[in-house]
Amino acid sequence: MNPIHARFSSVEALRHSNVDIQAIKSEGQLEVNGKRYEIRAAADGSIAVLRPDQQSKADKFFKGAAHLIGGQSQRAQIAQVLNEKAAAVPRLDRMLGRRFDLEKGGSSAVGAAIKAADSRLTSKQTFASFQQWAEKAEALGRYRNRYLHDLQEGHARHNAYECGRVKNITWKRYRLSITRKTLSYAPQIHDDREEEELDLGRYIAEDRNARTGFFRMVPKDQRAPETNSGRLTIGVEPKYGAQLALAMATLMDKHKSVTQGKVVGPAKYGQQTDSAILYINGDLAKAVKLGEKLKKLSGIPPEGFVEHTPLSMQSTGLGLSYAESVEGQPSSHGQARTHVIMDALKGQGPMENRLKMALAERGYDPENPALRARN
């Protein structure tokens, strides 16, 4: 059986993800809420969803696919979500006025059109997740900064962590991964202390916060954030946390554009919306390149990366999400976007319009909350 690369904690997580529909159709399977489903093309051209034990009934299922899409079972809901996402993807033959075979290549204009279409779709998905966050806050009457930030932090994949002997071995590897002469390591909870004031070895060995709090990874050749800066969030299965931390340290040694990194303690991996972050000087294109280099350095198999995009961030690939900083706004991604939502909640009218106005006023792209405004 081939490994499953597309995993989602619930139908809602699938609905609000930036999943690649074509990739799922090619792979032919996905996992939702711990259950595996087969993906097939129905006779009417729609996407059909099957449980593995239904393979013998495939022909009959395909004939009734349209009926099943409207059902209420988890399988039917998955089919509905996938078909809605497929319908939202611009059809290249309609957009370009002719059919185009990607394997045979084409003009640079066609390639640019494809990239532009993908970019617009991703922006819409990013904005949709941002609007959902704001509307949920408004419905719950949560207008305070802390409550809004809690909603964002709670948007997590909630991976189950290993236990017993495996957990202890992983923790030992995790500690070994954060020892490098070119980097300084310090718990975020002690940002107010100088490096020489903290006994890191003792903290890791004795303080219970070491297993759940964030560790900063800062190059000793201090690298200040520039005007064009952002963050790349990396999501992996908890058992690969130490392997990822080591790759992050190696990437920082090789690329001066990475100003620092941050990893959460192993007991908290997958329990919040982001568990590993790289802060970079550059733009979206730079983040994409660094993300791919990090994947290669890590040696983590494709199935080790999780499909999860934090609210108001832009997916740049499986397990990778990106968002930019704006000068004068909070450096924390969650806090910065929380302030935008707080502004929008004070206004009147459609939430979409309120959010776009609030984003523009704070220097963000009104069409994509992950990016800063371009002049």
From Swiss-Prot:
Biological-process GO terms, alphabetical: symbiont-mediated perturbation of host programmed cell death
Keywords, alphabetical: Hypersensitive response elicitation
InterPro entries: HopA1
Function per UniProt: Unknown. May serve a regulatory function.
Protein name: Protein HrmA
Originating species: Pseudomonas syringae pv. syringae
Lineage of origin: Bacteria, Pseudomonadati, Pseudomonadota, Gammaproteobacteria, Pseudomonadales
